[in-house]
């Protein structure tokens, strides 16, 4: 009798059959697809041998569309229907798009409050998810043609600073493109995979990732196949596009020319990008653009470009400083700096990074391709093709997650820079006697007060059995999956009643909000501690007043008139302190006075309870 065979978990049942899995770098300016072929990760070219796909989609009347190079070539004559840098709009509301008046698109605000924006095109209204799906589908077809096979799945990279809404929008785009999404991974992590495996690197590394629309800085520890992200930071609205815009605005100021039409704005922006790219190889370039029916020409020196964009470069270095502080790493402990993203080709950026870290950055892998290559390596392993692979990814979440407690305080469940995937639980209880429902308010941020953090979601746990205040035990569990998406569950331990929610906020944080939340978290730490102490003292005092009044209502008759008056006076004093004082110590002192003043009353209540329990019983019965 033949023995039945059982395959290893996660591996292909047929040892000779390889699943085709791809890695996709869905970029702001360009996108790429890569795969492992014959043991080597490589970017897949199109029929013309080009590995880069411009992240541009042009919509035509009658439902037609152009994607990639053909669409990019049409930006000048049809800017309103040619969508580029759509990554900046993923998971965003209309109010989040800074400088949208300079863009040639007809934006449409969401019908629901805080929803994701859309764009009006010749082919109808299109969401950023739909536009991104067109790009992903094009890369999918390229990979299928390259392997002449269906795909098992894909790993797609996202900026480390993408929040829940932006990550969910990316997942939706992958689904719309017909891709089986194996994992979302952070772009710096993908770059570290490529460098770690190709070069056998170990130690602490910084990944400086400046793309077309986003900037990420990650500090990683690489050791024996384990890639641990110690800390992440960045700016979700800083990239090569901003360097283009700064140069274009400066040239317009110098020449006195105004770009007012969508066509003129697009012409100036494309000319600025061409000028920026040319300055990578030469010290002096002529800026040339047709604006308002005339040709604008202006000589731009490399030092001019450096001066005009100095604020942008310093913004990136400020994020680097914050992230190193989070990681508790000094600059001289960083063994190497990996440059990722086409924008790191700019000499002004390379020079600034080298001066900051005191060492030349690593550039031996193509900065345009390194993220896609790392994603392909991870996809190959998730598909079960690399049985010997022992790669372990330890990504982190960028901002703390918690819930609101009494007094508007934030109780953190998962701290920022916590390794994901992760699940953490904490027990809470009710505030009032007979409370049968609990409102769960999920927030994100580094401050101690709910009003200073960002609201993510609200839900209710109902059906809690009526109990005395503090008797119920409600376990709240936060789960963050490998893609960085959050789900929250609340369960009352005695009855088993449970409620849960997948947190999918309608749109994401702006770059200003991200920077403010982190900076204020550091700048106001002492103030937050004092405020938290006051709020906690107030909550405890309120709870003591409620409990004391409840006890008086039930057993107040055991007190003499003088004893009752003394307790009433102490309660009045505590209420007066709560109304007038902002000193936590004063509130605590008044509460302690009431607690001490009711000790005899508590003993009398206990004696009464014992007498009632023993009434009518003899010693033998006991």
UniProtKB/Swiss-Prot annotation:
Q: Which domain of life is it from?
A: Bacteria
One Pfam family per UniProt:
HSP70
The UniProt function text for this chain reads: Chaperone involved in the maturation of iron-sulfur cluster-containing proteins. Has a low intrinsic ATPase activity which is markedly stimulated by HscB.
The molecular function terms of the Gene Ontology recorded here are: ATP binding; ATP hydrolysis activity; ATP-dependent protein folding chaperone; unfolded protein binding
Similarity comment = Belongs to the heat shock protein 70 family.
Q: What is the recorded name of this protein?
A: Chaperone protein HscA homolog
InterPro entries listed in its UniProt record: ATPase_NBD, Heat_shock_70_CS, HSP70_C_sf, HSP70_peptide-bd_sf, Hsp_70_fam, ISC_FeS_clus_asmbl_HscA
Is tRNA-binding among this UniProt entry's keywords? no
Q: Which keywords are on file for this protein? A: ATP-binding, Chaperone, Nucleotide-binding
GO biological process per UniProt: iron-sulfur cluster assembly
* Keyword ATP-binding tagged: yes
